[in-house]
């Protein structure tokens, strides 16, 4: 989401719609850290791993019942059981660890194979992307490791971390303390056995040139600034393993031919920026050379993105390492809208689930699935969610459950990764516990 308004816990977009590594240099990673990806991995330790994922000094394992994946995404050795990440010298299936290289840029990443491992995700919304006073400026608590561990214990596999960088930068240099804070949160996520997504979020709208003239046009200044920030972010995270995915933009990239926010889409500038993002990150070394990257759809909108003019960037790392970002808040009158105006032609709806509404959802996800297949790029549904509403527009609980379940199922059956937008309304910021409604939707979703 972009600039946000808090509506009963759902952040509504005004656009519509210090650790250098995963573990300390001497830390022993538990070989069973990713148990649950594909069974129970063998017990034991993988030895001491370098903070940049370089070498394993020969850990041991007592075996186990998993068919693959000792070490999980955290350790210096091992392979992710889903087949998404494969180290060259790691322990697999509870076998003993051995010595030698176990990570770094010699790993192989297959975005499509990662889909199952990424599972069901959530955002830490209205927090590190705050453009006022950062982490707690929008009434959110400080992110704690206990909260992150709680997310993992409740079944979350992916955590998206929206970030405002430019707001707090000085002369184009990202604030060092804020960079370290983001790195700390990412380290907690990966140590808990989950995947992290870090982006440049709305951040005041500079990517879209929202305050420029003409607005919503791509300028050389924007391109230079964008590349500069991704050089800094890429360098800072170069030693963090492939369980970190970098995302170029949020709901930006919505440049138009007439300078209007909702004007005629101008897709070539978005293609150019997606290419700039991929090329810039790949050049920053370490894991960036081959990590999975998430490129932006046009305003992350299905119908505006799934068109011939939208193209997938050329990746210096080869094919199969990119995801496409799409968000889903249809119908917005049910999921987001909080105020009716006089003679409003699109009034708020407090219920969802008619045959027509279900057909719209299925049609859009079918289109998205076809788009993914045609463009040969898997999808991360980086945001979806529905407000609880306030009187007199409180959303019916059964409808909220039905909508969240339908979106999650439509995603899972098509190999799309669903990532909930949450600001503490559905998931406790203390221990990661789910609301009763989200729990029902989560329980009903099974990934193939």
Regions found by a protein language model. Give the residues of each.
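Ser/Thr-rich, Pro/Gly/Ala-heavy low-complexity intrinsically disordered linkers and tails
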Residues: 1, 5-107
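Solvent-exposed loop/turn segments at secondary-structure junctions
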Residues: 125-130, 158, 164-169, 202-206, ...
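N-terminal carbohydrate-binding accessory modules
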Residues: 88, 96-158, 173
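Aromatic-rich peripheral "rim/lid" segments of glycoside hydrolase catalytic domains that contact
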Residues: 391-448
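An active-site-proximal structural segment forming one wall of the substrate-binding cleft
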Residues: 139-159, 169, 173-202, 206-248, ...
């Amino acid at each position: 989401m972009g600039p946000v308004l808090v509506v009963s816990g759902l952040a509504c977009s005004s656009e519509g719609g210090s650790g250098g590594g995963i573990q300390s240099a001497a830390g022993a990673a538990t070989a069973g850290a990713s148990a649950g990806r594909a069974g129970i991995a063998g017990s034991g330790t993988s030895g001491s791993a370098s903070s940049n994922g370089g070498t394993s000094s020969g850990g041991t394992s007592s075996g186990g019942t998993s068919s693959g994946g000792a070490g999980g995404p955290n350790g210096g050795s091992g392979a992710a059981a889903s087949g998404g990440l494969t180290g060259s010298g790691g322990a697999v299936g509870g076998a003993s660890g051995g010595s030698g290289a176990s990570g770094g840029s010699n790993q192989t990443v297959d975005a499509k194979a990662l889909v199952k491992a990424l599972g069901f995700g959530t955002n830490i919304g209205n927090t590190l992307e705050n453009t006022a006073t950062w982490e707690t400026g929008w009434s959110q608590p400080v992110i704690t490791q206990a909260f992150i561990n709680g997310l993992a214990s409740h079944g979350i596999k992916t955590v998206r971390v929206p970030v405002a960088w430019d707001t707090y930068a000085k002369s184009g240099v990202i604030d060092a303390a804020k960079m370290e804070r983001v790195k700390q949160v990412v380290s907690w996520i990966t140590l808990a056995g989950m995947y992290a997504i870090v982006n440049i979020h709305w951040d005041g709208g500079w990517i879209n040139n929202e305050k420029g003239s003409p607005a919503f046009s791509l300028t050389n200044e924007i391109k230079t600034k964008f590349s500069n920030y991704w050089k800094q972010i890429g360098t800072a995270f170069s030693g963090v393993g492939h369980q970190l995915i970098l995302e170029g933009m949020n709901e930006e990239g919505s440049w138009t031919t007439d300078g209007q926010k909702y004007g005629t889409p101008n897709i070539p500038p978005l293609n150019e920026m997606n290419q700039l993002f991929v090329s810039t990150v790949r050049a920053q070394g370490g894991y960036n050379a081959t990590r999975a990257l998430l490129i932006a759809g046009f305003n992350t909108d299905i119908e505006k993105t799934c068109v011939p003019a939208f193209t997938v960037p050329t990746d210096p790392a080869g094919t199969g390492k990119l995801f496409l970002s799409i968000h889903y808040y249809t119908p917005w009158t049910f999921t987001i809208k909080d105020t009716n105006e006089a003679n409003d032609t699109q009034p708020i709806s407090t219920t969802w689930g008619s045959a027509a509404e279900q057909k719209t959802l299925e049609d859009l996800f079918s289109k998205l699935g076809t788009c993914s297949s045609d463009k040969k790029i898997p999808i991360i549904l980086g945001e979806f969610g529905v407000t609880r509403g306030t009187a007199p527009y409180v959303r019916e609980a059964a409808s909220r459950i039905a909508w969240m379940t339908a979106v999650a199922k439509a995603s899972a059956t098509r190999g799309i990764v669903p990532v909930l937008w949450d600001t503490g309304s559905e998931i406790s910021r203390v221990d990661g516990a789910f609301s009763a409604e989200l729990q029902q939707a989560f329980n009903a979703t099974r990934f193939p």
